[in-house]
Amino acid sequence: MKEYILIAGVNGTGKSSFRGVLEGQGVPLGHIVDPDLIAKQNNFNELAAGKQAVREIQNCLKNGETVTQETTLSSHQVRKSIIKAKEQGYRIVMYYIGLNTKYESIYRIANRVRKGGHDIPPDDVIRRFTHRFEALDRIVPLCDKVIFYDNDNGFVKVAEITDGTFRYTNGYRPDWIVEYHHNKQTEQ
């Protein structure tokens, strides 16, 4: 079955590293769309890389190919692409990578820059971190399955949502997933 796979999380949570884990496990990811990699390979700024990423996703959907997108979920274009994919019979799977604090994300980005990687302004990270649950609220209802991983000290699966039902997958419950789940229960 064709899938639209999202590897999502705030900047610095380890999305690209997690993609490597999935590849190592032999998970079929299809065409991978990574705006950061597009920017680096083509010497594009963030806006141009984002536009190229949208074109690549649209081409995959048009051709019925499985596609994997790395995303912070901060763009409304992600939601539009998911809706289009659902209309075309795609199964939507999201892997969400979380951390407890924005400072951990900022620290990891600074470490990445020291190693020659790309930078993200701290204000952008703070804004995305602050609004991460709102972003999830826009996307989760469109997904067939959501798997939540904590990356405080390596990737640990902490929860999943299948067919709209949330469940913890083990006893490890980092603050961010407890807060997200509590907010969802309070809204119901």
Regions found by a protein language model. Give the residues of each.
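Short, glycine/charged-enriched secondary-structure capping and boundary segments
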Residues: 21-23, 47-48, 82-85, 108-111, ...
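NTP-dependent small-molecule kinase module
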Residues: 140-188
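Conserved substrate/cofactor phosphate-moiety recognition/catalytic segment
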Residues: 17-67
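Pre-Walker A (Motif I) flank of P-loop NTPase domains
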Residues: 1-5, 63-65
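Structural recognition of the conserved hydrophobic beta-strand(s) that form the central parallel beta-sheet
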Residues: 7, 67-71
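P-loop (Walker A) phosphate-binding loop of NTP-binding proteins
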Residues: 10
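Conserved glycine(s) of the Walker
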Residues: 14
